[in-house]
Regions:
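Alpha-helix N-cap recognition
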Residues: 1-2, 324
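Conserved ATP-binding module of the ATP-grasp superfamily
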Residues: 2-30, 99-100
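Conserved divalent-metal-coordinating catalytic cores
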Residues: 21, 34-385
């Protein structure tokens, strides 16, 4: 069978007219007891940034490597202190660096396996050819500086602030989803506009009007490097009914953050799978989760009553809330027409700049704030349905 397989490979070269005396066929013994297999790029395959990109699957099968069906990815900075590398990947990184020295290249595409004895097996090494050439590459040292700056920024933002909980988690999709709306690498204008219109304060003003805790002043979005993230501590605090006592608010936020830490795959589903933001018909059974997480019957009852009160008030006040929001959007529209009319008579650079500022402020005050409230009500409707 081995002989037939080798002859089949040789025939394929002939069919493709790939007749080269340098062609070779390498035979590896079958690797047993594989627990992890995958592909590692020694730099990011698109931009060539200094990260080991490990795409992997866990289990005995290695077919995911060849089929391209691997769904797990981890990125490790090339200049990271080796002691900080997760034990799971430490030996693999050592092997990769050894290969880089042998072939004198740090742009490689490597197929690998790891056995249950933590032995690294290299199946294939080839050049990484997908890196896009740019007119100006960012030096690795500059990336190191950005990482150091981001670490300092995170440490500062993670410190206890005026909100409940002594730590936070940053997510790119947990609330107001910047990853989807402005992208993972937004330009300066996109980021600043989204921050001004929504993430600086409109996001919590709308919620506070509905009876949730007012987290003023708290900016929801932060940028690390060029990527926007949502501060989940601020988000989770803003979705607690204001009537709950302070001690219980803190306990609830800590529970939410702990659950997100243990279930990071839920970061785009926090409204439905982590938080209790309104009363719905499954709430009493869902609140049972709190019993095994240190909440007393009295505390659970207080949370349930507060959510019921909040939800009833929102439903009863909805006609007025809706009417008020519509009035604000109509005011925004009328102001826009007035500004456009004034510009027709005097379209100077100064007037254009003034008009832009007026329109942005109107969008924020008369558009984004009511939208924040209505979006929250829409989420409540989705949860109840």
């Amino acid at each position: 069978e081995i002989s037939n397989a080798i002859n089949s490979v040789i025939s394929s070269y002939k069919i493709k007219n790939n007749r080269n005396n340098q062609n070779q066929i390498l035979i590896q013994s079958q690797t047993l007891n594989i627990v992890i297999s995958g592909v590692v790029f020694t730099r990011t395959p698109d931009a060539g940034s200094p990260y080991f990109v490990i795409n992997f699957e866990e289990g005995k099968l290695t077919t995911g490597v060849t089929k391209g069906s691997i769904g797990n990815t981890i990125k490790i900075f090339r200049k990271i202190n080796h002691k900080l590398i997760p034990q799971k990947w430490a030996n693999l990184i050592v092997s990769i660096k050894e290969i880089e020295k042998i072939v004198n290249s740090d742009k490689l595409d490597i197929e690998f396996g790891i056995t249950k004895n933590n032995q690294v097996v290299i199946f294939q090494v080839r050049p990484l050819t997908s890196i896009k050439r740019k007119s100006k590459d960012i030096p690795d040292n500059d990336v190191s500086k950005i990482i150091l700056k981001s670490k300092k920024q995170f440490k500062k933002l993670n410190n206890p602030l005026q909100l409940y909980s002594n730590k936070t988690i940053f997510s790119d999709m947990a609330d107001w989803n910047p990853a989807e709306i402005i992208g993972n690498n937004p330009n300066i204008l996109d980021y600043s506009l989204y921050d001004f219109l929504i993430m600086k304060n409109s996001w919590y003003i709308g919620r506070a009007k509905l009876g949730y805790q007012n987290v003023k002043p708290y900016r929801l979005m932060r940028k690390f490097g060029s990527k926007p993230y949502v501060d989940t501590r601020g988000s989770f605090n803003s979705l607690i009914p204001d009537g709950i006592n302070q001690k219980l608010k803190k306990k609830l936020v800590n529970f939410y953050l702990k659950k997100l830490t243990n279930n990071p795959h839920l970061h785009d589903k926090v409204e439905f799978d982590i938080l209790f933001t309104c009363y719905d018909f499954t709430l009493p059974s869902r609140l049972n989760e709190l019993k095994i997480n240190g909440f007393s019957k009295f505390e659970i009852s207080e949370i349930e009553k507060a959510l019921l009160k909040l939800t009833i008030e929102i439903i009863e006040k909805f006609p007025k809330i809706s009417s008020d929001c519509l009035s604000l959007t109509n005011k925004m529209s009328n102001n826009r027409k007035k500004i456009e009319s004034e510009l027709e008579h005097s379209r100077t650079t100064k007037n254009l700049i003034i008009s832009i500022e007026q329109l942005l402020n109107d969008c924020k005050k008369f558009g984004a704030v009511p939208f924040s409230a209505m979006a929250r009500i829409a989420f409540i409707g989705s949860v109840m349905l």
